[in-house]
Design a protein with these regions (language model features):
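Short secondary-structure subsegments characteristic of cysteine-rich extracellular domains
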Residues: 66-90
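Short, intrinsically disordered N-terminal pre-domain segments
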Residues: 1-17, 109-117
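Compositionally biased, intrinsically disordered linkers/stalks adjacent to structured regions
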Residues: 88-117
Length: 117
């Protein structure tokens, strides 16, 4: 089990997320103001394990047509889908690091936002 609370850093600002729910192989975390969330869960099916890491950020957004304010959520999620045997944590870490490095390369997020593939 991860430590409680979890700290994530967004744009240089640390956000503390306390565990608010834990059931077996799944835990939910949230900041005290509810503007940041994280879910970590694991599902086994056959000879595979799927791990979900999902981070959310809530903002107040104004609808440009009606000028009404409402909450909007942004989520970043990763699914690690691995066989039970064949890969160790170090090897998985290399793949995760490569993925992270590519995503934060200059211009990649903008291209993803523009729906390039």
């Amino acid at each position: 089990m991860f430590t409680d609370p979890i700290t994530i850093t967004i744009n240089g600002s640390a956000k503390t997320l306390a565990r608010i729910k834990s059931t077996g192989t799944s835990s939910d975390y949230a900041s005290s103001d509810g503007n940041y969330t994280m879910t970590v869960s694991h599902t086994m099916k056959g000879d595979r394990v799927r791990t979900l890491i999902k981070v959310g950020q809530r903002v107040v957004a104004t609808d440009p047509l009606s000028s009404e304010n409402d909450y909007a959520w942004l989520y970043d999620q990763r699914v690690l889908d691995r066989p039970i045997v064949g890969f160790d944590a170090t090897t998985i870490g290399y793949l995760v690091a490569a993925d992270n490095a590519w995503i934060v390369t200059a211009g990649v997020v903008g291209k993803l936002f523009g729906m390039e593939s």
